[in-house]
From Swiss-Prot:
GO terms for cellular component: cytosolic large ribosomal subunit; plastid. PANTHER family: 60S RIBOSOMAL PROTEIN L32 AND DNA-DIRECTED RNA POLYMERASE II, SUBUNIT N, LARGE RIBOSOMAL SUBUNIT PROTEIN EL32Y-RELATED. GO terms for biological process: translation. Keywords: Ribonucleoprotein, Ribosomal protein. This is Large ribosomal subunit protein eL32y. One of its GO terms (molecular function) is structural constituent of ribosome. The gene is RPL32B. It comes from Arabidopsis thaliana (Mouse-ear cress). PROSITE patterns: RIBOSOMAL_L32E. The keyword Transmembrane does not apply. SUPFAM superfamilies: Ribosomal protein L32e (SSF52042). It comes from the Eukaryota. It holds the Pfam family Ribosomal_L32e.
Amino acid sequence: MAVPLLTKKVVKKRSAKFIRPQSDRRITVKESWRRPKGIDSRVRRKFKGVTLMPNVGYGSDKKTRHYLPNGFKKFIVHNTSELELLMMHNRTYCAEIAHNISTKKRKAIVERASQLDVVVSNKLGRLRSQEDE
């Protein structure tokens, strides 16, 4: 099993999502973030006690950006030939099997990954136990 190259701790500055202002009051206003552009908007004018706006200061550290908690970056894999791209980068990237891959191909990908010493982040997904078969 490959050991991650990253030794620095991954720190997320903010865990809560930035939600759209007044999305909690109206059904028609969805939660996905939109920048407020109104002339009287309290959020745009940054009043105290209102919804926070995303800005550059909330970004994570450049050295740990896009890293998973296990210390690897994610690379989505659809077949075993794509898995072989990670052979030389197995300490930086881990494979993640795409969501639309069948159980049969998943087993082949997981088996090939163990031969190449590549970590698979979702290797237990959609695998049946002996009792079900």
